[in-house]
């Protein structure tokens, strides 16, 4: 998401918390794809609605949305592109079954820009009736960040050896 991209690019976010990890052993290269900002519905204008100044709206329903507005323009212009790469030089497992002390989790996730509450919510730990039901999380360490001068289109990334079921390098989901 764009708000996380801002934090990674400015060096504030140095740890990515994930529910999974690749089979690769660190170090390995990762690419940062900046998604489009999520829009939030503010209101819907419907035919016959009266505005505060007494004006009456006429027409089809109009959805009024807001995308946060606090994302810098330089990131907005790079949405839906690959904007950087980094090397994940270590992955620290966060084992929910054994992590009982709040300070231990905070230390393991330091640099993630997430609160303990956000981590617990993301992991789904708040719904667990016991520690043994908690799933693992993984703290991916971000190092050797390289920010692209020009963002790259996702279409420029492919596995050269990939051959789909139809014998081509295209998945057919266009």
Model-identified regions with their sequence ranges:
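Structured alpha/beta reader/binder surfaces that contact nucleic acids or chromatin modification marks
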Residues: 1-174
């Amino acid at each position: 998401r764009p708000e996380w991209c801002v934090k990674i690019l400015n060096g504030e976010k140095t740890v990515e918390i994930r529910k999974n990890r690749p089979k690769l052993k660190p170090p390995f290269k990762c690419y940062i794809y900046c998604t489009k900002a999520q829009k939030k519905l503010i209101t819907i204008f419907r035919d016959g609605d009266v505005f505060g100044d007494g004006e009456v709206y006429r027409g089809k329903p109009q959805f009024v949305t807001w995308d946060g507005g606090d994302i810098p323009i330089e990131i907005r212009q790079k949405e839906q592109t690959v904007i950087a790469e980094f090397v994940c030089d270590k992955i620290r497992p966060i084992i929910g079954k054994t992590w009982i002390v709040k300070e231990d989790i905070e230390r393991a996730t330091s640099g993630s820009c997430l609160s303990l509450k956000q981590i617990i919510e993301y992991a789904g730990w708040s719904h667990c009736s016991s520690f043994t039901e908690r799933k693992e999380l993984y703290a991916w360490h971000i190092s050797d960040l390289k920010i692209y001068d020009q963002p790259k289109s996702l279409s420029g990334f492919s596995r050269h050896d990939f051959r789909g079921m139809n014998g081509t390098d295209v998945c057919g989901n266009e």
